[in-house]
Amino acid sequence: MARYVFITGGVVSSLGKGIAAAALAALLQARGYRVRIRKLDPYLNVDPGTMSPYQHGEVFVTDDGAETDLDLGHYERFTGRPANQQDNITTGRIYRNIIEKERRGDYLGATVQVIPHVTDEIKNFVLQGNEDYDFVLCEIGGTVGDIEAMPFLEAIRQLGNELPRGTAVYIHLTLMPYIPAAGELKTKPTQHSVKELRSIGIAPDILLVRADREIPESERRKLSLFCNVRESAVIQALDVATIYDVPIAYHKEGLDSEVLSAFGIDPAPKPRMDRWEEVSHRLHNPEGEVTIAVVGKYTGLKDAYKSLIEALHHGGLANKVKVNLDWIEAEVFESEDPAPYLEKVHGILVPGGFGERGAEGKILAAKFARERKVPYFGICFGMQMACIEAARNLVGIEDASSSEFGPTREPVVGLMTEWLKGNMLEKRAAAGDLGGTMRLGAYEAVLKPDSKIAQIYGSTDIHERHRHRYEVNIDYKDRLEAAGLNFAGMSPDGVLPETVEYADHPWFIGVQYHPELKSRPFEPHPLFASFIEAAIEQSRLV
């Protein structure tokens, strides 16, 4: 039978509940337990797919095509377990399900209410499909006190009563701020947050307290007394250098031991922390460093590129080097020469994005990388812009553009109207909905055996995750290849270009998919490992 850990947050948002959940899952895995993590998001969007990156950050895509919260990326990277559609739910999806049931008459004429109908829907989501797991960790998005989170908190309160005794534990993550004028950490925000949580009917078993300095024993005792939590269950969560130090830090503070104790599991299997210690050692003891320019359009919010950032660091882990990131807003190149920005970097990465803003800057970045022989990695939109650059400057198609930007005589990149998903034909219309209408999830690609990318993968058959509505136009393939841009990877039916590369360039690869979504600290994605390796070679030339 699965045991349930419910993780809530208080005082302020962005305390790191997702990292805390992922780290705890990793610690339980290290003891040999099977763990699943689920995220419950209180916003009314059905999913984050149509939300601005500045509002939400990255949209993490799963193998089965779910557009989910970026925390699911942390879950995958820390546990290695691929997430799916059933690991993330939003208030919007819950209400949509309920309204569909009401329209069908499933409620037999009853008045549909938050309690019991909404809370029952949440509970069903939490409980379903957990037969193969020892622990299910549920992170509740938002902060205690938010009106949006109330149905979720009520649902997990009910579960605490309905689950067998000893199979549900509540962890509350809070902040203990340091007040310079007083010269001390303050417990009052945590006390009030716990008071709010208890007023809902949830008594936390464990307090995980964020702080920027050591919490004195006297303050821990104070929190224990006023929050009605055992002193051993008041666990400090101090700031660390990297997120991959968190599992080791939490283990030293006894978080996993306290969770197991709360479940009455004693003695518990000893954890094997060797792989986390190896990752931490490599991060803190690099043998060199490289600088990668990321030419993007959402650089004002780094969370928009969360998986990309982590995948680049994984590439550094694979090569035992530190990866420094130089963030460049693509629009800058539309009014300034790219050379001063890019001459000293060891690699250029152009990530995914949507819309015309910054496109010309990304095209110029691809041109600089091609002409100067600087390693170039184009992902999704970055591959499309590399193809437009080649069409303009190598093939001579001056008007080469993307139909995403408006009507064009030379749509080197165009809207996909249909594609195969398994044996089913998916179709889309230009005037259709935005939400859930892209090519989403894992798709197969076939690589040319003699291509550079096939050598990197060590295979000619790959499965990678996609999130795009536009695609390089196959009608331009022959002319682009004649100019030197090799279409090294295609969809199995030969219709959709998946990867491009230059044979006469040290490392210039564009991919239509998002390899960053499948990279792990213990298993760096081969493309990122190879890209950083090429950057190391470039660093010897600069």
Swiss-Prot record:
Q: Where does CTP bind?
A: S13, D146, I147, E148, K186, T187, K188, P189, T190, Q191, K222
Q: Which residues make up the binding site for Mg(2+)? A: D71, E139
Question: One Pfam family of this protein, by short name?
Answer: CTP_synth_N
Q: Where is the active site?
A: C380 (nucleophile), H514, E516
Catalytic activity of the protein: UTP + L-glutamine + ATP + H2O = CTP + L-glutamate + ADP + phosphate + 2 H(+); L-glutamine + H2O = L-glutamate + NH4(+); UTP + NH4(+) + ATP = CTP + ADP + phosphate + 2 H(+)
- Supply the alphabetized keyword list: ATP-binding, Glutamine amidotransferase, Ligase, Magnesium, Metal-binding, Nucleotide-binding, Pyrimidine biosynthesis
Q: Beyond the main fields, what else does the record say? A: CTPSs have evolved a hybrid strategy for distinguishing between UTP and CTP. The overlapping regions of the product feedback inhibitory and substrate sites recognize a common feature in both compounds, the triphosphate moiety. To differentiate isosteric substrate and product pyrimidine rings, an additional pocket far from the expected kinase/ligase catalytic site, specifically recognizes the cytosine and ribose portions of the product inhibitor.
What does the sequence similarity comment in the record state about its family? Belongs to the CTP synthase family.
- What is the protein named? CTP synthase
Q: What species is given as this protein's source?
A: Brucella suis (strain ATCC 23445 / NCTC 10510)
